[in-house]
Amino acid sequence: SSLYGGTLSYKTFDILAQYYDCDKDEQTWQKLSTFDQTAKKGQVSGLWSKVYTLLVNVNTIIEACDERKEVLNSEYYHVIKGEALALRGLLHFEVFRVFGPIYSVDPETECMPYSESSDLKVRPLLKASDVARLMIDDFKAAEELLKEYDPVIKKGALWGDEGPGLPNDMVYRSLRLNYYAVKAYIARLALYTGDKAKAYAA
């Protein structure tokens, strides 16, 4: 909730953009709105560390899907790994939007590492164009995994439980990073990098 319940939705960057009138009663936000370096550094570095911590967890799921594939049925394997790959692309995209360059101006600027493993090794900064390519690779891999197995494609948004004692893992798919959300992120990333044809095709 600290990311999507605030920092990446309505809070930190909207305050920095002066969308809100923060008075003295809201001391933390007022400091942020006046570009107080301590307040800004805490919010922004918190975003960076939180996202990369989440990426370790996501990569652990991706690795476990392949290492323990025999314990998952085919539907679970494809949906869980597909969602995790999409989430990896999404988390990198959020950091990319905040810390990356203006893509249309300088796509060759080194801006951030791309985390594809659960180990804690320090990775080199990559060019924005390389980060964009890796994100699209993750989204495309997720799309391939989900397209035959995500229940949302054939059954739509299932809002009811399966029934007493039955698992609900494959219902409420409209609240998850499902097949259509992945396609939307492919289009969004393509627009962000200026590839309108790829965005339209998505």
Ranges and model annotations:
Residues 17-18, 110-120, 157-174:
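Carbohydrate-binding/catalytic loop surfaces
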Residues 1-14:
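Acidic, glycine-rich segments characteristic of secretory precursors and extracytoplasmic regions
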Residues 67-76, 145-173:
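Flexible helix-coil transition and linker loops at the boundaries of alpha-helical arrays
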Residues 90-118, 137:
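Extended ligand-binding groove/face enriched in aromatic
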Residues 96-103, 150, 192-195:
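Short coil/turn linking the two alpha-helices of tandem helical-hairpin repeats
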Residues 27-99, 121-130, 144-146:
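Conserved, well-structured interaction surfaces
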